[in-house]
Regions:
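Hydrophobic faces of well-ordered beta-strands that scaffold small-molecule active sites
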Residues: 74-76, 95-97, 127-131, 163-165, ...
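Positively charged N-terminal leader segments that act as targeting/secretion signals
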Residues: 13-29, 59-60, 64-65
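Glycine/small-residue-rich loop that forms an oxyanion/phosphate-binding "nest" at active or ligand-binding sites
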Residues: 125-178
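Active-site-adjacent beta->alpha loops and helix N-cap segments on the catalytic face
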Residues: 82, 102-119, 170-188, 212-218, ...
């Protein structure tokens, strides 16, 4: 995808118009350019960044208040609604809602999002909605980005507790974090919550993270934390490898992230090894399709 950096607005104040019309016309912004749009030299001090970080902190406090009695948060990766009730009954307190798990998960339909969110909230569980327009790689063109912005707006208006997305771009020797697309999606999420006048949402950066080199992963943690991302879902190594083989790298990522964001281990975690993984890594959140006991 070829994009150009946004130019600072010539207006004294940022545009007030929000929503689909504004998003369809606004230029792409990297995380570093979000502050520039608001006429500030330091992105960390931008009005949007302060508000968004404050909203994320409030969301974390709310999570602690609601589920503070639980020692672990098991996030069940669901393909549509079918197994959500059973997963919640089995102890899942957070649902990552997807479609098409055969290709790694794509955006579920608006009807599925609404029904799942309503059910989960009635049963003291939270919903993270996947925002991914297709399978394959995580490098999106401008049309796909617009689709993602519209989809996340619909998900926020349906009441989801968080969004799950990720984006990379080709670089010499592999993949790099796509800061322009990331910035646009983070901005769209913030605009959507403001427009709906609702409580803040979490954002998980999904396993696109695992496409990055070990060195690039540390740089990505800095950028993602700076953007207000809540957590990173990662297997810690190549897909298909036993997660136990990735403990060393996962521990490295957890230590580096500190309290800036949560490293959420996933992939190859089940009821058989979840306690071992949690103890080895010292984590309180785990993700998977087999993370809670379900009948086959």
């Amino acid at each position: 995808m070829t994009t150009t950096s946004a130019k600072p607005t010539s207006e004294a104040n940022p545009p007030n118009k929000r929503g689909a019309d504004y998003l369809s016309q606004r230029p792409f912004l990297s995380c570093g350019e979000i502050g520039t749009e608001y006429g500030l030299q330091r992105p960390k001090e931008s009005l949007f960044h302060r508000n968004f970080m404050g909203m994320c902190e409030n969301a974390r406090r709310k999570t602690s208040a609601v589920f503070g009695g639980l020692s672990m948060v098991y996030e069940f990766c669901a393909e549509n609604f079918e197994r959500v009730p059973a997963a919640i009954d089995a102890g899942a307190r957070r649902i990552e809602l997807c479609d098409n798990l055969a290709v790694g998960g794509t955006t579920p339909s608006a009807g599925v999002v609404s029904a799942t969110t309503n059910y989960a909230h009635e049963h003291d569980a939270r919903v993270m909605c996947m925002i991914r327009p297709r399978g394959g790689d995580f490098h999106y063109n401008q049309d796909e980005l617009r689709m993602m912005e519209m989809d996340l707006g619909l998900a926020v208006s349906a009441g989801v507790d968080g969004l799950v997305f990720g984006c990379c771009k080709p670089c010499a020797g592999g993949w790099a974090l796509d800061e322009l697309t990331l910035g646009a999606l983070v901005m769209a999420a913030g605009c959507a919550t403001e427009e709906c006048k609702r409580e803040p949402i979490d954002i998980t950066f999904h396993m696109a993270f695992d496409q990055l080199s070990p060195e690039a992963q540390l740089d990505a943690i800095d950028i993602l934390a700076d953007c207000g991302i809540t957590r990173i879902l990662t297997h810690g190594g190549a897909a298909g490898t036993p997660i136990e083989d990735n403990f060393e790298n996962l521990a490295r990522l957890i230590e580096y992230a500190g309290d800036r964001l949560t490293i959420l281990p996933g992939g190859g975690i089940s009821t058989v090894n979840r306690d071992t993984v949690a103890a080895a890594l010292g984590v309180s959140e785990l993700h998977g399709t087999k993370i809670v006991p379900l009948e086959v």
